[in-house]
Amino acid sequence: MLDQTNYTPRLKAAYANSVRAAMKEEFGYKNDMQIPRLDKIVLNMGVGEAVKDTKKVKTAAEELSMIAGQKAVVTHAKKSIAGFRVREQMPLGCKVTLRGDRMYEFLDRLITIALPRVRDFRGVKGNSFDGRGNYAMGLKEQFVFPEINFDKVDEVLGMDIIICTTAKTDAEAKALLKQFNMPFIS
């Protein structure tokens, strides 16, 4: 078993050793605290079938917990919408917020293992930034992650992945993610 006190995730070590220096050189930061870093990664699964069967939210939360390595929180409806047959406080999905070492581990697994397993994968879109240095992407299948057993999946559920950075602009955030080998198309 690995000694937990001396273990540093691969991307966290890469950030400390090479990414910070490359970002400082590229953008000309005067202070080390100006250099953008990863803040958090939020994984979200919306379960549309939860209106008919609330047990599907529980299985989605279990799968998301396996993928993230930490317990998923069930999200509830804020208010009732009669057209969608949604009632207030009805479970609709689940989410996980990753920070610290788990965040770097997940990003490493996403880039090196999960994204290459996506069918017809050419790269991720480079225009999915929000204007404040955060990147959002979606996956249509949860079994691109090795933690999910393909045979035990009842229903194919997609997920949203939001990568939040401390970057002020989209260009800085894109450069940061490129340093982590995020495979952008454009």
Curated annotation (Swiss-Prot):
Record Gene3D superfamilies: 3.30.1440.10
* Classification via Pfam families: Ribosomal_L5, Ribosomal_L5_C
One annotated GO molecular function: tRNA binding
Q: Name one GO biological process term.
A: translation
Function of the protein? This is one of the proteins that bind and probably mediate the attachment of the 5S RNA into the large ribosomal subunit, where it forms part of the central protuberance. In the 70S ribosome it contacts protein S13 of the 30S subunit (bridge B1b), connecting the 2 subunits; this bridge is implicated in subunit movement. Contacts the P site tRNA; the 5S rRNA and some of its associated proteins might help stabilize positioning of ribosome-bound tRNAs.
How does this chain assemble? Part of the 50S ribosomal subunit; part of the 5S rRNA/L5/L18/L25 subcomplex. Contacts the 5S rRNA and the P site tRNA. Forms a bridge to the 30S subunit in the 70S ribosome.
| Protein name per its UniProtKB record | Large ribosomal subunit protein uL5
Which species does the entry assign this protein to?
Answer: Cereibacter sphaeroides (strain ATCC 17023 / DSM 158 / JCM 6121 / CCUG 31486 / LMG 2827 / NBRC 12203 / NCIMB 8253 / ATH 2.4.1.) (Rhodobacter sphaeroides)
Q: Which gene encodes it?
A: rplE
